[in-house]
From Swiss-Prot:
FMN binds at R130, A131, S132, G298, K313, P314, I315, P316, T317, R339. Its EC number is 4.2.3.5. Transmembrane segments: none annotated. It comes from Syntrophomonas wolfei subsp. wolfei (strain DSM 2245B / Goettingen). This is Chorismate synthase. One of its GO terms (molecular function) is FMN binding. It holds the Pfam family Chorismate_synt. NADP(+) binds at R41, R47. Homotetramer. Reduced FMN (FMNH(2)).
Length: 396
């Protein structure tokens, strides 16, 4: 079996539950490691009132003892503090106040209508509660564990916002030397950006959207430093690392496009200005001077930083709602309004880190499989020696 995880829970239910399977034994994981990542997700200028209620903290139920993974399934819970206000609406038994929060005017752009048609639900709350981005808190908790696994092999994950609405911002070209600096800067920024000069413009765009009852999307970059060559494969479509990464990024609510490296810009350029040339020197071995490919060629990691961009549409809940249809009365009305963020791009970047960490961790374990961290480390050390001996690969 391969590394996998599953989540469950509703936005206003008792909490979110997750299970991580096939995590090798011996990975150092603590609740505080996970809580730090959960706190990063909750930050961001443009978040809604829910973040004033929730203070996400994980409770690990199984799979970890004395601070280390056991190799058994890791189960965990994140309680929803807001459930106190929804107990009689989201009860698993009789919902005494069920009628108060019925949703039958689907929001354009949300799962409301399509989900209700698929699952034959007249009350679309039964759809939106699970489709809500609240679920991503459970993903970030799992992602914290995948990051701890990768960090055991000096593989680091990062993210940075690329745009908020129409405001495009500068990003860093990230490497082993500046990774920590970038992490500190984006975590200090309410927009998760290194471009302090453009921060007022981003804030202004969000404030204007709020005043108009609008929402804003944007884009972010995620990357992994220290990925060895050889993860993923060209042998079959599902084994290509780039296809796995894009699928995982687009599983994040509201993400409507993803690219590996400079994929979109590269489509308009001649090949001579796109492909990353290969160089060799006695000191540096095989190396590249550019990384427009995003660290993946032929579906396989090539030893450069693996990086991607994801593009987020504006959140579907608008405080000046669009036209919809009341599916009980069958007449046009304005869509329902749910408490929501104005802009969640900074938070989505943290979720993107988790999804990318999962993709790389899964591919890493497929390549260097083992039941314990020590067993995997032996396999990886042997592979590193092979790369250096046969392929003059010095980035070890």
């Amino acid at each position: 079996m391969v590394l996998r995880f599953i989540t469950s829970g509703e936005s206003h239910g008792k909490g979110l539950i997750g299970i991580v399977e096939q995590m090798p034994a011996g990975v150092e994981i603590g609740e505080e490691d996970i809580n730090r990542e959960l706190q990063r997700r909750q930050k961001g200028y443009g978040r809604g009132g829910r973040m004033k209620i929730e203070s996400d903290r994980v409770e690990i139920f199984s799979g970890i003892r004395n601070g280390y993974s056991l190799g058994t399934p890791i189960s965990y819970l994140i309680r929803n503090q807001d459930f106190e206000n929804w107990q009689e609406i989201m009860a698993t038994g009789e919902c005494k106040r069920h009628e108060e929060k019925i949703v039958n005017r689907p929001r354009p752009g949300h799962a409301d209508l399509a989900g209700a048609m698929k699952y034959n639900q007249s009350d679309m709350r039964n759809i939106l509660e699970r489709a809500s981005a609240r679920e991503t808190a459970a993903r970030v908790a799992a992602g914290a564990m995948f990051k701890k696994l990768l960090e055991s092999f000096n593989i680091r994950v990062y993210s940075q916002v690329k745009s908020i609405g129409p405001v495009q911002v500068k990003t860093w070209q990230v490497n082993e030397q500046n990774w920590q600096d970038l992490r500190e800067k984006v975590d200090e920024s309410p927009l998760h950006s290194v471009d302090t000069e453009k921060e007022p413009l981003m804030r202004e765009a969000i404030d204007q959207a709020r005043s108009k009852g609008e929402s804003l999307g944007g884009s972010f970059e995620v990357g992994v430093i220290g990925v060895p060559p050889g993860l993923g494969s060209y042998i079959s479509w599902e084994s290509r690392l780039d296809s796995q990464i894009c699928a995982l990024l687009m599983s994040i609510p509201a993400i409507k496009a993803a690219e590996i490296g400079e994929g979109i810009a590269n489509s308009a350029e001649p090949g001579s200005r796109v492909h990353d040339e290969i160089f060799y020197s006695e000191e540096g071995g095989l190396h590249r001077k550019s990384n427009r490919a995003g660290g993946i060629e032929g579906g396989i990691s090539n030893g450069e930083t693996v990086w991607a961009r994801a593009y987020m549409k504006p959140i579907p809940t608008l405080y000046k709602p669009l036209t919809s249809v009341n599916t009980k009365l069958w007449q046009e009305e304005k869509a329902d309004i749910e408490r929501s963020d104005i802009c969640a791009v900074p938070a989505a970047a943290i979720v993107g880190e988790s999804m990318l960490a999962f993709a790389i961790a899964r591919a890493f374990l497929e390549k260097f499989s083992g039941d314990s961290l020590d067993e995997i480390r032996k396999s990886y050390t042997t592979y590193q020696a092979y790369l250096k001996r046969v392929w003059k690969w010095e980035k070890i």
